[in-house]
């Protein structure tokens, strides 16, 4: 039985990249980006009798990362994106989650100390600059050390490219079904 996030993070390690073909769409409350559709809904796709909860757990993380990749791709059409992505929040506490994100984005993922508190750290940094305790926002960078950088594992690329293609097609193929079930046809 799972006792907390630490156990969930460890369980992801037991499933190969691509979650044995299971794909999760994280649109549990509709979606706004990269497409706007309040009727879009979450789903697990390609579940079989052999599918276990560990595949489902990993597919949820992969699905969230696929959605981030899709947004990142769209953003890249309008503005230059950085070579590395800074990952913050509670999700950044899981090493496997960070590696999955790096693999799916095909970018380095940088995690700072206490990533779950980075919002408060950022607010404190702004106050410190405003009060003159720190000279500039550039100086703040020195105060927030990078803990780890995760590099994409090219061995996982084929599985993730396959699942990402399916992920995007799931929306295209189900857009009308979402409207029928959840909104206006």
Model-identified regions with their sequence ranges:
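Glycine-rich phosphate-binding/hydrolytic loop that grips phosphoryl groups
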Residues: 58, 62, 99-102, 114-143
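Single conserved hydrophobic/aromatic residue that forms the stacking wall/gate
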Residues: 1-9
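N-terminally biased helix-coil "hinge/interface" segments that flank
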Residues: 10, 18, 73, 77, ...
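Acidic, glycine/GT-rich loop-and beta-edge segments that sit at the periphery of enzyme/chaperone cores
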Residues: 3, 131-185
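Short beta-alpha connecting loops at secondary-structure transitions
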Residues: 45, 105-112, 145-156
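Activation-segment/catalytic-loop signature of the eukaryotic protein kinase fold
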Residues: 19-111
